[in-house]
Amino acid sequence: MNLARPFRRLVSCAFKSWLTVRSLLPKQKCQTFSKSGSQKGAQIERIFVINLDRAPSRWSNMQQELRRILDSSGDELLNLTDRHVAVDANEFLVDPSKDDDIDPFYTLGDQLFVEPQPLVFPTKFELNFPIRMSRAEIAVARSHINVWRQIVASNYAFALILEDDVWFHNRFSKNLDQAWDEV
């Protein structure tokens, strides 16, 4: 018997209830976001949400989240948001091969260079052992690269990329404004 499953359901139910109750709280205002052409200085002008076509409920949840936060002019962040269709790993007929954008092979050494783990002491052999990205990892990477290209082709000085499973902490606006001011 898997004892973790009942607790996962309980936690999931409690979390969904909490998200519903949050909708009764006042909307947050975040000065870090603004429409293009604003004269208020450097602000995030566009939000891109990566969402699979086969996951419309996740897009609906994101829309609800983005309605909870207001930009510097008092408009919902949803008005600054573009939905970007994610690359679906289920549509790959074969494992994708290396191309100009993505090399599906990496090593533990590559991973530890990007994300150091001080408690991991691998041997030299382990560091150079090739690891193949899963189809899902490749699809995620392609989705992000496609959004980056869209941002580069635009005139947005600053943009935010989100995946469709984000929820905003009740101190999101305050914390982001503070961090943005420090940058």
Predicted features and spans:
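An acidic/histidine-cluster motif and surrounding catalytic segment
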Residues: 3-162, 166-183
